[in-house]
Curated annotation (Swiss-Prot):
Gene designation per UniProt: rpmJ
Entry GO MF terms: structural constituent of ribosome
Example GO biological process: translation
InterPro entries xrefs: Ribosomal_bL36 (IPR000473), Ribosomal_bL36_sp (IPR035977)
One cellular component term from this protein's GO annotations in UniProt: ribonucleoprotein complex
Keyword terms of this UniProt record: Ribonucleoprotein, Ribosomal protein
Family named by the database record: Belongs to the bacterial ribosomal protein bL36 family.
Keyword Isomerase assigned: no
Name this protein carries in UniProt: Large ribosomal subunit protein bL36
Pfam families: Ribosomal_L36
Length: 38
């Protein structure tokens, strides 16, 4: 998982979600696209 100041969708399968006040990107197609804002 990447921790970034600015999270962006990296492909069309990426979804931006907010979990417990933390913005995250989850991706079903490419697990390397997982990100967390921090």
């Amino acid at each position: 998982m990447k921790v970034r100041a600015s999270v962006k969708k990296l492909c069309r399968n990426c979804k931006i979600i907010r979990r417990e006040g933390v913005v995250r990107v989850i991706c079903s197609a490419e697990p390397r696209h997982k990100q967390r804002q921090g």
